Regions:
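Extended hydrophobic-aromatic, low-complexity segments
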Residues: 1, 18-21, 121-122, 142-146, ...
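Glycine-rich phosphate-binding loops that contact phosphosugars or nucleotide phosphates
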Residues: 1-104, 184-230, 248, 256
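Active-site phosphate/pyrophosphate-binding segments
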Residues: 51-180, 256-259
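Hydrophobic membrane-spanning alpha-helices of multi-pass integral membrane proteins
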Residues: 179-187, 241-246
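C-terminal functional extensions of proteins
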Residues: 224, 235-259
Length: 259
């Protein structure tokens, strides 16, 4: 599958990740062009890749990457928009829409941070949980994986992320009374399906923390807690969704005395 017409994109905060370096070298051996999105300037991947885009997030002091993850997402958005432009796949209207969505992100995330006390309160209720499960569909599932990873990395709580569409195929058997479920509900055309998933886990005794775009107040009837996100284009919504998940993990870890 990999030849001289293949572009391999490598994403690494440190630029020293052993398996990513091995994949890069194998791709280059097969003739592929390699493009790295890296935070650490002058790192191995940055030096050896054919092209590199630095995210300039600054050093990550903690084990878990947070700001670098957010800048990596932004780099991917920009690259995708640029490539779509080059392939003449974006109308001027769509291009303007996506650029505006990116420009709004800093303000939207600032608004989220103003409400971090709410996330801290939720964390204070469930920082001693044995397991926390994350559910999402399509883009939300990708963010669920990141949220679950962060919680595991810094709080040492057992956590897994599952595609909500597969809930009935084994996953739901893990839900019992008091299990904490974080349900990501920001994909507009799948919102009703996520509501259905929330009802299913609630019926088995789960405590549900939902993350949804502001305006979807009907979710309050089903979830125990709702974290609302400022409205934004669905394309860049993962950049907003990940912030409360990072904060939740941080507060849980801090309350457990692991900071």
């Amino acid at each position: 599958l990999v030849d001289d017409k293949t572009l391999v994109i490598l994403i690494s905060q440190s630029g020293e990740t052993a398996d990513t370096i091995a994949a890069m070298r194998e791709a280059k051996r097969l003739g592929a062009r390699t493009f790295a999105i890296v935070n650490a300037v002058g790192s191995c991947i940055a030096r050896e890749a054919d092209d590199v885009l630095y995210t300039w997030a600054g050093p990550e002091i903690a084990v878990a990457t947070t700001k670098a993850y957010s800048t990596q997402l932004t780099a991917i958005y920009l690259m995708s928009i640029y490539m779509a432009q080059e392939l003449d796949m974006l109308t001027p209207e769509l291009l303007a829409k996506y650029i505006k969505a990116l420009e709004k992100l800093p303000d939207n995330i600032s608004k989220l941070l103003e409400n971090k006390g709410e996330i801290q309160y939720i964390a204070s209720k469930y920082f001693n949980s044995k397991s926390v499960f994350f559910l999402g569909r399509t883009l939300d599932y990708a963010v669920a994986l990141e949220g679950s990873l962060k919680l595991k990395e810094i709080s040492y709580i057992h956590s897994e992320a599952y595609a909500a569409g597969e809930l009935k195929h084994g996953t739901i058997a893990l839900i019992e009374e008091g299990t904490v479920v974080v349900a990501l509900c920001t994909v507009k055309n799948l919102f009703d399906k996520m509501l259905s998933n929330i009802k299913e886990v609630k019926a088995r005794g789960a405590v549900v923390i939902a993350v949804a775009e502001e305006g979807h107040t009907e979710i309050e009837k089903e979830a125990d807690y709702v974290i609302y996100l400022p409205k934004c284009d669905e394309l860049v919504m993962p950049s907003e969704v990940v912030v409360p998940l990072q904060l939740f993990s941080y507060y849980v870890s801090s309350l457990k005395g692991l900071d």
